[in-house]
Regions:
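Sequence context of c-type cytochrome heme-c attachment sites
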Residues: 1-92, 99-169
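Divalent metal-coordination and catalytic microenvironments
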Residues: 2, 96, 179, 263
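Generic recognition of stable, solvent-exposed alpha-helical segments in well-folded globular domains
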Residues: 20, 54, 91-95, 151-154, ...
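Detector for Asparagine
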Residues: 27, 50, 95, 99, ...
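Long, well-ordered mid-to-C-terminal structural blocks that present hydrophobic/aromatic surfaces
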Residues: 162, 168-185
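Mature extracytoplasmic or organellar-lumen-exposed domains after removal of signal/transit peptides
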Residues: 184-192, 196-268
């Protein structure tokens, strides 16, 4: 199952692990070493010539004692967000995931009502699911932790692995049934479809305004420039919800909707 997962099949570790500021999450062995040394992603200086993917040894203490204890997770300690001092994710076994699935940066502050966007990647970086669960890291709007953070024991692990410890890490519908009895899909009461429609509307407005561009390969880039704060926030929040978090509200439906609703107001 692991081989079919994105962690198991992606070659991103080859592309990114050679950079010291990327190796924590993109090199499985660097992650293990960094966790053992109690280093956060921004403190890592390890660069391996032969990087490894996020394999068994990245998450588990394989071949340490040669006993059943080797299946123990590398860490389940609560995670302090290095880009957001004072913010902590404490989601049980899901804490392991949050070490990497956290924002690397925050939206730029406005100066005289304008935000200077200087990067084509104006977003929190890939995989900030833990901050979405907490209801934070959006531009111009803070939220609250979702029920999927506060009520689901072991957060990420419960929903993405289920009782069978599914190592594809694809969300397991069976994990939802304790609260959402008899559902047959993740789009409960059409909530995800409604949010998707608003995300699509916002995307069209951002393209029309020239704040993002279509790269023609299924990806989009931010267009650098000096923008009114509300529009820059809209650019950030669209990317955060639609491109980086990717759950279409499943991680925090209330916060995701609030971010997109506020963004749409920037384009009357």
């Amino acid at each position: 199952m692991y081989a079919a997962s994105l962690h198991g099949s992606s070659l991103v570790y080859v592309e990114e692990a050679g950079r010291a500021d990327c190796s924590y999450c993109h090199d499985g062995s660097a992650f293990s070493e960094s966790v053992a040394a109690d280093l956060s992603p921004d403190k890592v200086e390890v660069v391996h010539t032969n990087a490894t993917p996020q394999d068994c040894r990245a998450c588990h203490q394989i071949h340490t004692t040669y006993t059943a204890a080797d299946w123990a997770l590398e860490t389940t300690a609560a995670v302090d967000f290095y880009a957001m001092p004072g913010v902590t994710f404490d989601g049980g076994l899901g804490n392991l995931c949050a070490n990497c699935h956290q924002p690397r940066r925050l939206a730029s502050p406005a100066v005289d009502g304008k935000v200077d966007v200087t990067t084509s990647r104006y977003n929190p970086h890939h995989g900030p699911q833990s901050s979405m669960l907490l209801g934070t890291a959006g531009a111009g709007l803070e939220g609250k932790p979702s029920a999927h953070y506060s009520m689901v024991e072991n957060t990420c692990v419960t929903c993405h692995m289920g009782e069978g410890d599914n190592h594809t890490f694809e969300p397991q519908l069976s994990a939802c049934l304790a609260c959402h009895a008899d559902i047959e899909e993740f789009d409960v009461n059409g909530a995800q479809s409604e949010l998707q429609a608003k995300v699509d509307e916002l995307q069209a407005k951002l393209l029309a305004a020239g704040l993002i561009k279509d790269n023609g390969n299924g990806s989009f880039s931010s267009v650098t420039g000096d923008y009114p704060e509300a529009q820059a926030n809209a650019m950030w929040n669209w990317d955060y919800v639609a491109v980086q978090d990717k759950s279409m509200g499943a991680h925090n439906m209330t916060y995701a909707n609030a971010l997109i609703d506020a963004a749409l107001l920037a384009f009357p």
